[in-house]
């Protein structure tokens, strides 16, 4: 009887010790959420809602071309500002789809205005979620029109695969591949093609 009593004490004590030493599955992420806001995993990069647009896109090499373009266009402070701003952010792969030499030309100092025009053609004043875009599409017979900071027009539609497609002034299409990435100064959506404005030569 004594032996069984001792065995029970050992088991119970061990369980208590394990419970005391147990750690949450994601202690770092949980603490970040509590302190800094929501965390969203975007292709392996953890973007935090308390960061501004520049801070978050700067966390991943996938947006290095966009970051450089924003800097060269003199728009860094714009996308750091309180906003709110909605940015449709092209990935590096999206920029690679541009015709050969166009990006290199845009990044030259004498094309700063053209580059500024291109980047601001991806931005809208206000914080616009995918649900907001969908509602506007549905309330306008399947097509929504948005005015960008550059003054250009973006048309949004829903394709057969239920993707939201943005159409630029040239008829070029870009799919929103990642969406509703909250920023301290607005909203970030990732797009798979560059939206090229029509009225300026690129």
Give the residues covered by each predicted segment.
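Bacterial Sec-dependent N-terminal signal peptides
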Residues: 1-24
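Mature, structured domains of secreted/extracytosolic soluble proteins
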Residues: 18-202
């Amino acid at each position: 009887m004594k032996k069984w009593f001792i065995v029970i004490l050992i088991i119970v004590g061990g369980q208590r010790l394990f419970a005391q030493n147990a750690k949450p599955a994601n202690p770092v992420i949980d603490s970040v959420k509590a302190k800094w806001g929501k965390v969203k995993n975007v292709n392996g990069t953890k973007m935090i809602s308390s960061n501004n647009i520049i801070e978050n896109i700067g966390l991943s090499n996938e947006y290095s071309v966009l970051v450089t373009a924003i800097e060269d266009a003199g728009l860094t402070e714009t996308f750091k500002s309180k906003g709110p701003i909605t940015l449709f952010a092209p990935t590096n792969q999206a920029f690679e789809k541009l015709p050969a030499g166009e990006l290199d030309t845009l990044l030259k100092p004498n094309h700063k205005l053209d580059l500024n025009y291109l980047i601001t053609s991806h931005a809208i004043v206000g914080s616009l979620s995918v649900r907001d875009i969908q509602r506007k599409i549905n309330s306008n017979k399947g097509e929504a029109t948005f005015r960008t900071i550059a003054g250009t027009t973006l048309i949004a539609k829903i394709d057969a695969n239920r993707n939201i497609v943005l159409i630029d002034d040239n008829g070029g299409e870009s799919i929103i591949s990642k969406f509703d990435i909250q920023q301290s100064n607005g909203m970030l959506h990732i797009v798979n093609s560059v939206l090229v404005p029509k009225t300026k030569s690129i």
